[in-house]
């Protein structure tokens, strides 16, 4: 399934979020490095949750649009001209 411009924009935004949180440097004492990794990991979890919300909202919107289209298609089928039933003569 090819991605449209909206999906590409969302993917660029998600990629930017991940790039904005680089892995911590190896400088400092063991305790400082451990704390930096812990903070980095917590930020990664937040970014992951945010990315899920961004991408999940898009999928929900598509699902709502698909359901609306099905409802319209069904209404169109119901209102089409149907042939008269055979008469019992």
UniProtKB/Swiss-Prot annotation:
It is found in: Host nucleus, Host nucleolus; Host cytoplasm. It holds the Pfam family REV. Its main location: host cell. A motif (Nuclear localization signal and RNA-binding (RRE)) lies at residues 29-45. It comes from the Viruses. The RNA-binding motif binds to the RRE, a stem-and-loop structure present in incompletely spliced viral pre-mRNAs. This region also contains the NLS which mediates nuclear localization. These overlapping functions prevent Rev bound to RRE from undesirable return to the nucleus. When Rev binds the RRE, the NLS becomes masked while the NES remains accessible. Escorts unspliced or incompletely spliced viral pre-mRNAs (late transcripts) out of the nucleus of infected cells. These pre-mRNAs carry a recognition sequence called Rev responsive element (RRE) located in the env gene, that is not present in fully spliced viral mRNAs (early transcripts). This function is essential since most viral proteins are translated from unspliced or partially spliced pre-mRNAs which cannot exit the nucleus by the pathway used by fully processed cellular mRNAs. Homomultimer; when bound to the RRE. Multimeric assembly is essential for activity. This is Protein Rev. It comes from Simian immunodeficiency virus agm.vervet (isolate AGM155).
């Amino acid at each position: 399934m090819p991605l449209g411009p909206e999906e590409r924009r969302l993917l660029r935004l998600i990629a930017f979020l991940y790039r904005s949180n680089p892995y911590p440097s190896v400088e400092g004492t063991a305790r400082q490095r451990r704390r930096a990794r812990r903070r980095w990991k917590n930020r990664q979890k937040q970014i992951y949750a945010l990315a899920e919300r961004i991408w999940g909202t898009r999928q929900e919107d598509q699902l709502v649009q698909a359901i609306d289209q099905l409802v319209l298609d069904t209404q169109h089928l119901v209102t089409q001209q149907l042939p008269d039933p055979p008469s019992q003569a």
